Amino acid sequence: MIVAILSYPDSFSVFKDLSSENQNILQICCTWGKSLEDGVLTFHTNDSQHLVTDNVVKKSFEQWSSKLGKVNFLETQNASGTDVLISFNDKGKQTVGQTTNVLNDKGFIKRVNIRISVNSSEVKLAEDTIKLVLTHEIGHALGLGHSNFHDLMNPIVNYQNKVITNCEIDAILLANNWKLVENLQQPKKPELPIEKTVDCKSEQM
């Protein structure tokens, strides 16, 4: 079993256990603050050991941008000040993906750290699996929590759908409504959503 997890600050760590739900539920984790005001999120990849190809990172972000459309991802050459920092290692842990969303004092995301292990229990993961894990972790970086059904945001990689669904896109728009929806009409200040879960009903593409 390969697991991808999300780390929350203490104030965001208490979520309802989804295992008892009869519905297809997707959690909303967090909301971007002023870093998203220009509609651009920067990212930097720390892979000094060259454990993955550049194509893995590029395609993972392209998968989100092609479906979301309202956020531009810009790669930077410097880790300092980047919005999303991605690090690869070969530690061989069972948990191959972990995202830590760092929040400011008002509860908004100010930066994200994604750590990916290219090994699971000493076995090298296939490149397609690494890409799937990274795509899942980018979902966390965009404000998604976990789901209790077979889709991309399921915490167990073996149960994940490789396709980003409309429900996941709707949840990101809800999480970052102040910028990705309301800001299209007039400038808005960052605002946290009231809803913390989305009922996906069925896995719609």
What are these regions (language model features)?
Residues M1-V52, Q94, T100-K106, L180-Q185, ...:
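Disordered inhibitory propeptide/activation segment of secreted metzincin zinc metalloprotease zymogens
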Residues G39, T82, K110-V112, F149, ...:
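Residues that flank catalytic or metal-binding motifs in active/ligand-binding sites
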Residues L41-H44, I114-R115, F149-K162:
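Surface-exposed aromatic
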Residues S48, N89-G92, N119-S121, I156-N158, ...:
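Solvent-exposed coil/turn segments that connect beta secondary-structure elements
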Residues T53-E137, A141:
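Metzincin-family zinc-dependent endopeptidase catalytic domain
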Residues I138-L152:
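Catalytic Zn2+-binding segment of zinc metalloproteases
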Residues I156-L184:
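Post-HExxH zinc-binding segment in Zn-dependent metallohydrolases
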